[in-house]
Amino acid sequence: MANRNSAGFGFIPAGTLGNTPSTQGLSEYFIDAATAGDTFNGEAVRVTAGYIVTAEDSATAEPVGVLQGIFYNAATTLKPTFAHWYDGAITPANSEDVKSFVNDNPFQLYNCASDDAVASTIVGAHAKYLDTFSCTANTGGSTTTGKSNTTLDIGTTHATTQQWRLVRSAEDPENNDLTAAYCTLEVVQNLSEFVGTGT
């Protein structure tokens, strides 16, 4: 049976490892003023030279977390401006940097969609639980909604070296077919700037 999802939706917070309560609090980081390119809500990000950039450009990049929104003082109006995503390039007033809000709990669980069937059988799919995957083949987002359309790249599985570790099916009733594309999965960071490389 096909899943209802027909596209990716990035990474959506969904509890924490160990089934402990998740505060889903956000930490403040900076995006360098006038940085070109978009960074979407639900996109994995990392820190380079002190600034937030995408972590979806390399299968072995170590994310700091997932972008949830930004804040800056608009250059033309000088008004405080909150946004769902970074619509690059943004140059704030007074030569300031853009503040970004990132879910950086390395034990945060996320729901994401697969780009393909996890396996041809349910038993085969279960055998891939706790393997690691990247998301580099299917990134981007909507410049209308600002939402990421990243999916988990099922073709790049490895026991230890990829960014995201598949924990289980998210048991989303309309997107629970592991033998079809766009099933909803639960993942956790395998590579992290905070807790090591996962190897």
Which residues fall in each region the model found?
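Surface-exposed, low-hydrophobicity beta-strand/loop segments enriched in small/polar/acidic residues
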Residues: 1-199
